[in-house]
Regions:
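Amphipathic alpha-helical segments within well-ordered protein domains
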Residues: 26, 87, 103, 117-118, ...
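Cytochrome P450 C-terminal beta-domain/meander region
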Residues: 100-106, 153-157
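Catalytic palm subdomain of template-directed nucleic-acid polymerases
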Residues: 112-128
């Protein structure tokens, strides 16, 4: 399991490099007066078609652009290759059962499921959902003085990698259809699961989406609502992984 964890972490490192390479490319274009007409809608097929039309009169400027672009393309290709390998990992007996359950949650795709499983491995070592949430650093801190309790920001102690994964998953859940119609993607992921597992995962989706919406309606910022959604998701994941779905 340790080797699988290191491989997925290597993929994460490539993702960070990819993000930086894209930022460097955009900075180069902007400081040299080359602005994408549809600013903000970067990295689409249309964007890459546009960037191929960008030309500089000076040879070295053009070569600089080519280098920035080459780095982006190279990292993109490497990540796609590693993603394919992680999908192969998902079929290994050591992780398959857990991955198949996790992908029933809206917001948790195969890559996220594999990364979660290899990071946590034995979910039963957490006696309660609260222990699991605490391990991920998703519990608010507390400053107690006498009878007064002040809630502080998240402790952010523990496994920051899974915490980040769950925050992104919660954001994805919030974007799902609120009227009960599932996407083809989630239907495909749930098709071989038992009705009990599907019902439990769907319950999680509804609860997380409702909680995040409620918090935002109360004026809480996006990060606060995302953390709350991630906390709920962690509780549901703990239940799923420990057979407590009744």
């Amino acid at each position: 399991m340790e080797a699988l964890k290191e491989y997925t972490r290597a993929r994460d490192a490539k993702k960070r490099m990819f993000k930086k390479a894209k930022q460097e490319l955009l900075s180069f274009l902007l400081r040299n007066g080359k602005s994408y007409p549809e600013s903000g809608n970067y990295w689409t097929e249309k964007f890459f078609k546009w960037i191929k039309t960008v030309q500089f009169s000076e040879k070295w400027m053009q070569e600089a652009l080519n280098e920035y672009l080459s780095e982006v393309y190279s990292l993109k290709a490497k990540i796609e290759l590693m993603d394919a390998r992680i999908r192969e990992i998902a079929e290994l007996e050591i992780v398959k059962d857990k991955v198949d359950k996790l992908i029933c949650f809206s917001g948790i795709d195969v890559i996220t499921a594999v990364e979660t499983v290899v990071e946590i491995n034995d979910f039963s070592r957490f006696a309660t959902a609260a222990q699991f949430v605490s391990y991920l650093g998703l519990c608010p801190g507390e400053d107690s003085s006498g009878k007064t309790k002040n809630m502080l920001p998240l402790t952010k102690a523990g496994n920051k990698r899974v915490r980040a994964l769950f925050c992104e998953s919660a954001k994805a859940i919030k974007r799902t259809n609120p009227y009960g119609q599932k996407s083809k993607r989630i239907l495909e992921r749930q098709k071989n699961a038992s009705p009990e597992i599907v019902a439990y995962a769907d319950k999680a989706t509804k609860r997380i989406r409702t909680k995040m919406k409620h918090l935002e309606e109360r004026g809480k910022n996006y990060n606060v609502s995302s953390a709350a959604g991630a906390r709920e998701l962690a509780c549901f994941v703990w239940g799923m992984m420990n057979g407590k779905i009744a």
